Design a protein with these regions (language model features):
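Membrane-interface helix-loop-helix junctions at transmembrane boundaries of multi-pass membrane enzymes
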Residues: 220-228, 317-341, 453
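Extracytoplasmic/lumenal acceptor-recognition loop(s) of multi-pass membrane glycoenzymes
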Residues: 81, 85, 462-487, 499-568, ...
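Hydrophobic alpha-helical membrane-insertion signals
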Residues: 5-81, 480-499, 503-518, 522
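Membrane-embedded helix bundles of polyisoprenyl
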Residues: 23, 112-129, 135-217, 229-249, ...
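Active-site lumenal/periplasmic loops and adjacent helix-entry segments of GT-C-fold
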Residues: 29-167, 191-195, 278, 289-301, ...
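Periplasmic/ER-lumenal interhelical loops and adjacent helix-loop junctions
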Residues: 47-59, 91, 226-227, 234-324, ...
Length: 786
């Protein structure tokens, strides 16, 4: 059985406009709050504030200026690999390039509204084939655009790019298989791949599930010829969109966060039983803030995008559909996805079998759930027969959440308490809003289901309720951190000129921050030790743990690790004024207050060592392991860490560090080591947008150290001749120079980018020829019919 696409005038732009203006109304009150409170542009919480706003502004300026190496990204990282996961392939980012970089923070909300509109339009286009009623197809698009997943992931922003584009690829697959339409599917495959390679891996898995479920339900019928053509178009689309894939893949293979396999029972069972409860209730209750745990306290729940909630209608329509159409492909898809959600290894299949738990693939079955719900509602007799029972079941299951608020237990003092909730008020707000949606839907069903404009009434109700629950979610997320984030704009956007005027520009140096927001380096265009990005140079991930710094999604060296600042050429620390007393109480060696801005007190490092210097001694890995990780930076200020091969090659230039020096880790010894490194500094150092240059004038041959993350993309020359780059200190770089005056140049080229760009360019050319052939064939067929 085949389902030809519903033939009626498209209402795409009507859905687009409905979703866009609903999103405008959703964000407008919070934008007004920020403006009235003196905060300027809309800011939210967590990742949105610390990453998305500054990523968009920084990347906008970086792309316009050109370059390949970003000094403002942590200790320095390749720009492409650092930002391809977040925005570099997104069409929404490239659209934002028409906006001046300085105005990008104000463009974030319009972009969010646009993404929701595109998502709603895409959901509608996909659903109209299956729902076969324009009004109910429009509702499907609105449900998808304002699902709990979309509202939750405003927090992450760039996840909504994927939500927006995916329905178009799924609709193109249906067109290719059912209607034998050629040419569109490769385009959408390419666009989704280039938009986000990480999510595309999950999309590929889902498309396979969807394809086989459609075939099992006899909606997809294709012979060998059509199957080969579909495989060809898939491969062509992947080739067209692989421009960022190869560079990202080469980098991710070295990133420890991407290599985290399961073992034993981990394949089959989640480590905490409450994880199952959280998954179950994710379809019933509207989502809480991404950084809170209320209903369940154990398990991996924060920042996981664990929600499959649909506004107003909830899961009732999906349950009724699955009972009514047991052999429909949608039922198969939803059942397979439920199984995937509850089995760890199947859930991780959407993330290349990484054992870290996420539910960031739920938007795909949510789209099918929207289609199934509207399919049912568009058929009055079927809905009349099945929906009431499903609605009663949904109501009952939702009410069971109250148990968590009243179940008895014991507190730390042995007293009887009721409820297992950390913040009951938050729970009751979420539960109350969810129940309000159920009641409204039940009343509308009872009084309006037989009205001629029932579909339009329910669509209006869904959009109105989306404003209510969406605003509650935004409020729970945004204002819970208001005491922390209310000064975001003052400490970032508004401080750019003040900080630039306060900091000298006489040499290259890094900065640090204390008690401030993440990623100040991007705002002030300087390398900063406090940095929040998951895809920085892999050698940063290797280096930091060796000096006592946990490096997962953040670089956050403790202030007490003061010797690390000397090693990494940190000259100034920007201390938020409300944290200055806390900073001074630490009484860290070598810091003097030298100035201030409206937002920060500036402390200068008396033990600052300019970038690029030499050593008198080397230390071995065995020696360094005898020193605690938190104190190794003190030794690395005294001696460079070399492996056995490097000792054989450069041992004649350096003395082995005596073992007794390993215990000499006093503050005075650190200051003396920094003074020695300053005295052995290069004659000049210049950071460039493709790497750096340096000049040396040493009396003897030397191994010159640079605290720049090692990367295979770097090549080096000394006096114009190629030079080998040494990986030292578990992830930083050094180069050998002869005695006398020398010019060193390090140039960064993104590994794999040239190859992948050539593949994409060639594939796009082939795709163009393919489209031309399709057009000529179509024109010929039209001519023959005449």
């Amino acid at each position: 059985m085949q389902t030809t696409i519903f033939k009626q005038k498209s209402n795409y732009w009507r859905v687009f406009a409905l979703c866009f203006f609903t999103a405008v109304l959703l964000f407008a009150p919070h934008c007004i709050v920020d403006a009235v409170a003196g905060g300027g542009c809309f800011h939210y919480a967590g990742d949105f504030n610390d990453q998305q706003i500054n990523f968009y502004q920084y990347a906008n300026a970086f792309v316009k200026n050109g370059g390949s190496f970003s000094w403002a990204t942590d200790l320095g990282s390749g720009f492409v690999n650092s930002y391809s996961f977040y925005l570099l392939g997104s069409p929404f980012f490239w659209l934002s390039m028409v906006v001046p970089a300085r105005l990008m923070p104000w463009a974030m909300v319009p972009l969010l509204c646009l993404k929701m509109a595109v998502a709603g339009g895409g959901g509608y286009l996909w659903a109209r084939r299956w729902v076969r009623d324009e009004t109910w197809s429009m509702l499907a698009g609105c449900l998808y655009a304002f699902s709990g997943f979309s509202i939750y992931n405003i927090f992450f922003n760039h996840f909504l790019d994927v939500v927006a584009l995916f329905p178009y690829m799924l609709a193109a697959l249906d067109d290719a298989v059912i209607d034998d339409k050629k040419g569109a599917f490769p385009f959408w495959v390419a666009l989704n791949l280039v938009d986000n390679y990480f999510f595309f891996a999950g999309q590929a898995v889902f498309l396979i599930i969807y394809f086989f479920c459609m075939a099992a339900g006899r909606r997809y019928e294709l012979g060998l010829r059509k199957f080969v053509r579909l495989a060809w178009e898939t491969a062509l689309g992947c080739a067209c969109g692989c421009v960022l894939l190869l560079p990202a893949g080469l980098s991710l293979l070295q990133n420890p966060r991407t290599i985290d396999p399961f073992s034993g029972y981990g394949y089959l069972f989640y480590g905490k039983s409450q994880q199952y409860g959280a998954i179950f209730y994710s379809t019933l209750l509207m989502p809480d803030a991404p950084y809170f745990k209320d209903l369940f306290q154990e398990g991996i729940l924060k920042h996981t995008s664990l929600t499959a909630y649909l506004p107003l209608v909830g899961v009732a329509g999906g349950l009724a559909f699955c009972r009514a159409r047991e052999r429909h492909p949608f039922t198969y898809v939803l059942k397979v996805c439920v199984a995937c959600a509850f089995v760890p290894v199947l859930n991780s299949a959407f993330y290349a079998l990484n054992s870290s738990y996420y539910a960031r693939w739920y938007y795909m079955p949510i789209l099918v759930l929207c289609g199934a719900t509207c399919y049912l509602l568009s058929r009055p007799a079927l809905a009349e027969q099945r929906l009431p029972r499903a609605l009663r079941l949904t109501t009952f299951l939702t009410l069971t959440a109250v148990v968590f608020a009243v179940v008895p237990g014991k507190d730390d003092d042995g007293n009887t308490v009721y409820g297992v909730l950390d913040e009951p008020a938050r729970f009751w707000a979420i539960f109350g809003m969810t129940m309000l949606g159920i009641v409204i839907f039940a009343l509308l069903w009872h009084f309006c289901r037989n009205k001629r404009r029932w579909g339009a009434i329910l669509t209006a109700a869904v959009l109105g309720f989306s404003l209510l629950y969406g605003s509650l979610h935004l409020s729970l997320t945004k204002y819970a951190q208001w005491d922390v984030d209310s000064n975001l704009i003052a400490e970032t956007y508004d401080s750019v000129e003040d900080v630039a005027a306060a900091l000298p520009d006489d040499a290259f140096y890094r900065i640090d921050a204390y008690g401030a927001h993440n990623n100040l380096g991007l705002w002030f265009n300087r390398s900063c030790l406090q940095f929040f990005n998951s895809t920085v140079a892999p050698s940063i991930m290797a280096f930091y743990p060796e000096v006592g710094v946990k490096r997962d999604v953040n670089s956050k060296p403790d202030a007490e690790n003061y010797a690390l600042r000397g090693l990494l050429s940190v000259r100034y620390t920007l201390v938020a004024k409300d944290k200055e007393t806390e900073w001074t109480d630490k009484d860290l060696p070598g810091w003097q207050r030298t100035g201030e801005t409206d937002a920060y007190a500036l402390y200068e490092n008396e033990n600052w060592v300019p970038m690029g210097f030499t050593y008198d001694c080397y230390v071995t890995a065995d020696q360094l392991e005898r020193v605690s990780e938190e104190e190794r930076a003190q030794i690395l200020c005294r001696a460079i860490l070399l492996d056995d091969d490097q000792i054989s090659a450069f041992g004649s230039l350096l003395e082995p560090l005596p073992d007794e020096e390993l215990t000499n880790r006093s503050e005075d010894a650190y200051a003396a080591d920094c003074a020695a490194r300053r005295a052995a500094g290069v004659a000049a150092f210049t950071a460039t947008d493709t790497g750096f240059t340096a000049k040396t004038a040493y009396d003897a041959d030397e191994l010159v150290f640079f605290s720049v993350p090692y990367d295979d993309g770097f090549s080096a020359t000394v006096n114009g001749e190629p030079a080998a780059i040494e990986k030292v200190d578990d992830g930083l770089m050094a180069v050998y120079v002869p005695a006398g005056e020398n010019e060193i140049e390090f140039t960064y080229h993104t590994p794999g980018l040239r190859v992948s760009a050539c593949v994409s360019a060639a594939a796009i050319a082939v795709y163009g020829v393919y489209l031309l052939g399709i057009m000529r064939k179509r024109k010929s067929q039209l001519g023959s019919k005449r």
